[in-house]
Amino acid sequence: MKISKENGITHLDLHGVRHQDVSDEVIDFVFQYQKDIPLMIICGNSNRMIELVEEALNTNCIVFSMPRFGIIRVEKL
């Protein structure tokens, strides 16, 4: 997991994160950086990783979009 800032937007890169850890990592990231929304979550090409991130965000009523396949943008809490 890598957190970086690009063009003023904070990114979470989930490459290398185990599927069982995705939900906790995503929710921790969103709440830790909520003042910086919008946020980007890079899931990569794994459909399962994308599903896990969407599930975690939906469970916590977090509004998001997917501007490109494998990239999720957190819009608001």
Where do the protein language model's features map onto the residues?
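Long, charged, low-complexity intrinsically disordered regions
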Residues: 1-77
